[in-house]
Regions:
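A short SAM/SAH-binding and catalytic strip from SAM-dependent methyltransferases
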Residues: 38-52
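C-terminal lobe and adjacent flexible extensions of AdoMet/dcAdoMet transferase-like proteins
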Residues: 133-139
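A short glycine-rich, Lys/Arg-flanked "PGG" loop and its adjoining helix->strand segment in the class I
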Residues: 55-67
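Class I SAM-dependent methyltransferase SAM/SAH-binding core
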Residues: 1-29, 56
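Short acidic/glycine-enriched loop/turn segments that link adjacent beta-strands
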Residues: 127-131
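Conserved Rossmann-like nucleotide-binding pocket used by diverse enzymes
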Residues: 23, 41, 72
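C-terminal alpha-helical "lid/dimerization" subdomain adjacent to the S-adenosyl-L-methionine
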Residues: 72-116, 120-126
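A short acidic, Gly/Pro-enriched loop at the edge of an enzyme's catalytic core
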Residues: 28-40
Length: 139
């Protein structure tokens, strides 16, 4: 909630922030209207979730996106050479603070988006350790 307060304060200082809405709540149940937003953006969220929650987040994103709207997520890239080559002790230490990372590293996010009705789902490597996954809601 503190970051939302910072975002709201910064919005007050801008001339045109009327289109932004900062919300603290469950991503799986936003209470937003169907077809009401143009973009759903998740940054470093999915690796924190069990697979069932990831699927629920995608279903909710699809529901609230307007036709033609964009889903975008940035997170760790399980296929990244950097992550693949981590020493076992360091990888174990990293996973010890991330209880759902085993699930995250085995799910196919692109296929999950397609299964939830999204089209044009694809991923791009953002940097040596991270990826961005994009998809759109059909028109």
């Amino acid at each position: 909630p503190h970051m939302l307060a910072v975002a709201s304060l910064r919005d007050e200082q801008e001339t045109d922030s009327s289109q932004r809405l900062w919300v603290h709540g469950k991503g799986e149940d936003t209470k937003m209207a169907d077809n009401s937003v143009d973009v759903v953006s998740l940054a470093f969220v999915i690796h924190e979730c069990p697979e069932t929650a990831t699927d629920a987040l995608m279903k909710e994103a699809f529901r609230i996106l307007r036709p033609g709207g964009t889903f975008i997520m940035t997170d760790n890239n399980p296929q990244s050479a950097v992550i693949q080559k981590l020493p076992p002790a360091l990888f174990t230490l990293m996973k010890s603070t991330e209880p759902h990372s085993n699930e995250y590293y085995t799910i196919n996010v692109v296929n999950m988006l397609k299964a939830n009705g999204f089209e044009h789902a694809h991923q791009e490597q953002t940097d040596p350790r991270h990826r961005t996954v994009l998809a759109s809601k059909p028109l």
